[in-house]
Amino acid sequence: MMLEARDISFGYGDRRLYDGLSLSFAPDERVALSAPSGFGKSTLCRILAGYEKPWAGQVLVDGSPLPRPGRGAALPVQLILQHPETAVDPRLRMRKTLAQAGEVPERIIEGLGIRETWMTRFPHELSGGELQRFCIARALAAKPKYLVADEISTMLDSVTQAQIWRFLLSECREQGIGLVLVSHSPALTQRVATRVVDLASL
């Protein structure tokens, strides 16, 4: 099941970020998007996951248009953000946040090190690393075909980074999930990615 960005054009106001950009991703790939700061990598992540509508062009999954978030359809592309606090409802306890994706397999909860005591807390009562684990668990529980990970471990300590990436890569391999990632860490990109796309050269 291919993920394809076809002839994407997008910008803000008079500033055009992309003009006829085309990319494709296979389900067995882990693709890093590389470009200078301010180039629009996060914007492209949002477009690939359906959270931003391009001026022109479309995103396809297995040849069909990507469903838009919030329309009741199971989303084949899940977006994980750098700042998890922006991706959760601050009024919900974490157990209800997880439940938004349906039933979360115990292997995901255990693999990400999510503690039972965290389940009854609100987002503001958790650290960034703890909250990010919930966001990743929710994304995986949705049984996506692709994950788009936008700087998901930048704000985390090295131990938490290693644990999260180890589990995430294992799940992607075992469940056949394609991965698109953005990271400013060359070491992480080298360790994780099977292919690097230099957006500035396209």
Q: Model features per residue range: what roles?
A:
Residues 143:
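Conserved catalytic motifs of ABC-family nucleotide-binding domains
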Residues 49:
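Helix-to-loop junction immediately C-terminal to a conserved catalytic motif
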Residues 136, 148:
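Hydrophobic anchor residue at the start of the ABC signature
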Residues 83, 90-105:
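Q-loop/switch helix immediately C-terminal to the Walker
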Residues 64-78, 92, 96:
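ABC ATPase NBD coupling module
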Residues 3, 17-20:
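Conserved structural motif at the start of ABC-family nucleotide-binding domains
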